[in-house]
Each structure stands twice: as C-alpha cells, then as structure tokens.
Amino acid sequence: MIRSVIRGVGSALPKKSLSNDEIAKFVETSDSWIVQRTGIRQRYIANENETTVSLGVEAARVALINANLTIKDIDCIILATSTPNHTFPASAVEIQHALGMSHGFAFDIQAVCSGFIFALTTGDAYLRSGVAKRILVIGSETFSRILDWKDRTTCVLFGDGAGAVVLEAQEIQSDVALECGILSAKLYSNGAYVNKLYVDGGPSTTQTTGYLRMEGREVFKYAVCMITDAVDDCFAAAGINSSQLDWFVPHQANKRIIEASAKKLGISMDKVIITVDQHGNTSAASVPLALTTAICDGRIKKGDLVMLEAMGGGFTWGAILIRW
C-alpha cells in the first residue's frame, strides 16, 4: 500500500525583522506587554520586492535541494495562502512557472492559518489515490499587507514567511504505525465563527483588500478546545496513544494557546516546538516553518512520532500525525 512520506523541507523569511521595540514606536505597546501576552519577540516583514510567490519559490527550492530532487520530479504544487499575489490566477501557478515547471498542475488552498494542514492532507490523498507521485506542498504568506498597523491588538501578532515540503508516495509492506509517513489526518470547519477572525474586505463585497480583524479572547477560547479535539481524533484514527508522541508542532499563533493546548493534551512542553517568539504568527507558513526549524536543528529525527496541528479563521482546524 501507498503511504505519503515527507522527503525534504525548506523555509524562507524576508530580509527585514521587526522587533517589539520598533513596533512600540508607532503604536501604544511595549516589548514586555507583547511578550507577556503572546510570547512574540520579533517577526519578519516583506519588503516591496518580496511577495507570497517569491518567498514560496525560495522555500520550495530549499525543500527540493534537501530532498535531492529537481522540479522535473514534481507532479503537482499545492500552495496554502490567504495573501496571494493576485485575486487570480492562483499564486501556485506563478510559483510553478518561476521554478521552471511546465508539466503537471498547481493550485491554491485557502484555509487561513490551517491552510498548510489542509494542503498536506490534500496532497496525501492525491498520492494515495495515484493522482501524483511527488508533490510540493507550500505555505507562504505576507500578512503584513493586510494588517491595520494602527491596531495594536493585531499588528503585533503577525509576520511574513514561507515553508515547504516535498511529499512523496512510497510503497510500504503493511499499514503499521512503525512505517514512516502520514499515519492519520483530520480536518474540520465551522462557518458560524466567521466574524471572530476575518478580513473586512474582498473583491465581491467591498472591492477592496481590507484589514485583518480579530476577537482575540473569543479565538483563544475556541482554539484550545478545537485543537485538542482534532489532535485526539488523529491519535484515535492511528490507534496510537499520546504518550508515544515525540514532538508536537503546533500552529505558532500565540504562546499562551500553545501552552494551554499542550497542557490539556498532557504533552510536556519539552516536546513542543516553539518558533512564535522569532517568527510571530505567519498563518499558513507557521507549521512548515516550525517543522523545518526542528528538522534542521536536529530535534526531529528519523522514526520520531510527530503531530502537526493548526486552527484558523472560519473557523478551520485540523491535525496530522506523522512517523518521521
């Protein structure tokens, strides 16, 4: 049977970082206030020449190098983003062209901060059904373009960046949890919560881009329950106990949400990958950025059991369990 295996990872960040102290120069806030409430110390902000596409291309190239593959080996590109270069066409086809790929197919997925989880699950289904053999799954965002930089409740939270993985179909001998690859995935959404986290504009309504708006306390309240339920469902689907987990790679939204989720799941914080302090919330790029960081610094090793999760506007949420 076929199982989807991550063959290589990569990431990209804009050249400029923006510290809390720098933000405090133009909105009423402070480094201590931001760190205490979010855990964020800095984030990266794209310049006028850096875009969702350019960051996605950079991350994809690194992932291909780490996978020891070229773009000719890829059948499909799936890009998770809420900040495309254009309303249409999909930014994925722009990445496809920039990478020199004229075969196969490419498309975008929009599930906000859960986007990478949705994209990776879609790629997994394509591989297992034989639609493709190798897929580039990318999360790339330039949320700085949709922030109201006068709103201290949101502008301190988000940053720009990209992460990518090469997903490959591999034949395994039996469907056992010790075999590497994606073991289970669970996706959910509920549109009843649209007004809790959204952008107040769009081509079909205001005909403007709009700004990100959020009810922070409400998002926190729902996030912990939704995240932990999805993770528990993933463990159950794979027939694995949470005590067997080696690493928890959560969406890097807010350190408080991460800590509360880990506590509710009974996961020790020394098993939790945290990059929100350096990157802020990079939406769909958050999980692959954190994953790449933990692989490149040697924490995640072959054979490790790794749980990915995310929750975003909509609400959308989900989790993926992987044997590395």
UniProtKB/Swiss-Prot annotation:
Q: Which InterPro entries match?
A: ACP_syn_III_C, ACP_syn_III_N, FabH, Thiolase-like
Provide the primary localization: cytoplasm
Show the catalytic activity. malonyl-[ACP] + acetyl-CoA + H(+) = 3-oxobutanoyl-[ACP] + CO2 + CoA
Q: Which organism is it from?
A: Bartonella quintana (strain Toulouse) (Rochalimaea quintana)
Kindly indicate whether the keyword Acyltransferase belongs to this entry.
yes
Q: What class of enzyme is it?
A: transferase
What's noted about domains in the record?
The last Arg residue of the ACP-binding site is essential for the weak association between ACP/AcpP and FabH.
User: Single GO molecular-function term?
Assistant: 3-oxoacyl-[acyl-carrier-protein] synthase activity
Task: Recite the lineage of the species.
Answer: Bacteria, Pseudomonadati, Pseudomonadota, Alphaproteobacteria, Hyphomicrobiales
Task: Please report which protein family the annotation says this sequence is part of.
Answer: Belongs to the thiolase-like superfamily. FabH family.
What is the protein named? Beta-ketoacyl-[acyl-carrier-protein] synthase III
List where in the cell it is found: Cytoplasm
Its biological function? Catalyzes the condensation reaction of fatty acid synthesis by the addition to an acyl acceptor of two carbons from malonyl-ACP. Catalyzes the first condensation reaction which initiates fatty acid synthesis and may therefore play a role in governing the total rate of fatty acid production. Possesses both acetoacetyl-ACP synthase and acetyl transacylase activities. Its substrate specificity determines the biosynthesis of branched-chain and/or straight-chain of fatty acids.
On the tree of life, the source organism's domain of life is Bacteria
| GO biological processes | fatty acid biosynthetic process; secondary metabolite biosynthetic process
EC numbers, comma separated: 2.3.1.180
Q: How does it assemble?
A: Homodimer.
Gene3D superfamilies to which the protein is assigned, alphabetical: 3.40.47.10
Record's signal peptide? none
Residues covered by region (ACP-binding): 252-256
Q: Which GO terms describe its cellular component?
A: cytoplasm
| Keywords from the named record | Acyltransferase, Cytoplasm, Fatty acid biosynthesis, Fatty acid metabolism, Lipid biosynthesis, Lipid metabolism, Multifunctional enzyme, Transferase
Which residues are catalytic? 113, 251, 281
Pathway named in the protein's UniProt entry: Lipid metabolism; fatty acid biosynthesis
